[in-house]
UniProtKB/Swiss-Prot annotation:
Pfam families: Muted
Name of this protein: Biogenesis of lysosome-related organelles complex 1 subunit 5
Organism per entry: Rattus norvegicus (Rat)
Modified sites of kind N-acetylserine: 2
Gene name tied to this protein: Bloc1s5
Residue numbers spanned by region Disordered: 1-27
Length: 187
């Protein structure tokens, strides 16, 4: 029954061919040992799959490592080719494009800077003219104000004199009107 070598008789076989001795129900210690050994072999054949699974695992790991190693080599080779292509073709093109674009951009930037500088100068000149005009206007207004204040007492005196004359005329007129009214009230 065992798969690896000599077979040992099982308890039933030992009882049949063992002479004529009567055995008890459990049998002898040697027979029990044989039964346990046979049960262990049956158990290992039916239920213990460790040797098979270990072999499969070793095979899977070996295949995986071989395929992975080849895949990594291919990936590294592709990366190397891409880097070489980039260094040989793409990088010079990018440099040329960048140089051309930068020169044009710098020229435009310089032109914009010059025009802004001119605009700032014009604005400063315009502000200076406006400030000069405002300063001159302010000085002129101050002179006019001072002249006005100097002429004010004379004008006030003239107005006061004119007012006094008008008051005198009104008094005389009212006095004359009272006389005329007194003439008419005697009737």
């Amino acid at each position: 029954m065992s798969g690896g070598g000599t077979e040992t008789p099982v308890a039933c076989e030992a009882a049949q061919g063992g002479g004529g001795k009567k055995r008890d129900s459990l049998g002898t210690a040697g027979a029990a040992h044989l039964i346990i050994k046979d049960l262990g072999e049956i158990h290992s054949r039916l239920l213990d799959h460790r040797p098979v699974t270990q072999g499969e695992i070793r095979y899977f790991v070996k295949e995986f490592e071989e395929k992975r190693g080849l895949r990594e080599l291919r990936v590294l080779e592709n990366l190397k080719n891409m880097i070489q292509e980039t260094n040989e073709r793409m990088l010079p093109k990018c440099r040329e494009t960048m140089q051309g674009g930068l020169e044009e951009t710098l020229q435009r930037l310089q032109a914009a800077t010059d025009s802004i500088h001119r605009l700032q100068q014009r604005e400063q000149e315009r502000k200076k003219v406006i400030n000069d005009h405002l300063t001159a206007s302010e000085k002129q207004r101050m002179l006019q104000w001072e002249e006005f204040l100097r002429g004010q007492p004379q004008r006030r005196a003239e107005v006061d004199a004119e007012h006094r004359k008008a008051m005198e005329r009104l008094r005389e007129q009212y006095a004359a009107m009272e006389k005329d009214l007194a003439k008419f009230s005697t009737f």
